[in-house]
């Protein structure tokens, strides 16, 4: 097998090669061992692994898995019930979404999802560690009703250190971004609905920071689509209705174990002519 390098698509032998990753960087330790920093291809997880634990994914296997991923997105969209509108003439304004994504490929796929759902969404590929620095300005520019803060995350080592923010790869950046968004919100009285988090994110701290929905209560992996499902449901729910996870729990990969929250007021506005 050739030497693994940045940009390669790999899986981890120690995890039975269950998840496909892209190698983002390779670190050389003082004892000459090499550690790869990995980002999930179809789940929002960031991880690391010794080079010797990695297996290169063949082109055929990669194409097969990517096809399965695309089909999963299409199937998830197809399962969403069609909303029956009143026979009266009406103008429907769904909530406007601003989506910040730390992963470029996920950002591109998110645009596709929102378009297929007919939603008004702006998607920006912003690295997790820069999201807090730009969110206030972006909120000022786009004035959304719903904010999605996501990308990749993961617990670093001891799975028992649930309450140590330093044991999470990107939760601290998501937390800072939520706080910045709430500063904007309080100043402008927008009543912004916020989803924040990715795989294994520090759920409690994200909620304390001001998120309405967040991941991951059980510190499990979440699906690429889970943040988008939350945003979509808030966007298409009438502004007179309060929406909770129970209203769309079946659309989430692992239900309340992956995503939960306090709920929020819907953002759809219907004007009858």
Regions found by a protein language model. Name each.
Residues 218-273:
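C-terminal functional extensions of proteins
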Residues 2-5:
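Short, well-ordered loop/turn sites that connect or cap secondary structure elements
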Residues 17-28:
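Short beta-strand-centered aromatic/proline hotspots
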Residues 41-88:
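Intrinsically disordered, low-complexity, charged/polar segments
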Residues 139-153, 211:
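Proline-aspartate-enriched helix->loop->beta-strand connector
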Residues 176-222:
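Catalytic cores of nucleophile-dependent amide-cleaving enzymes
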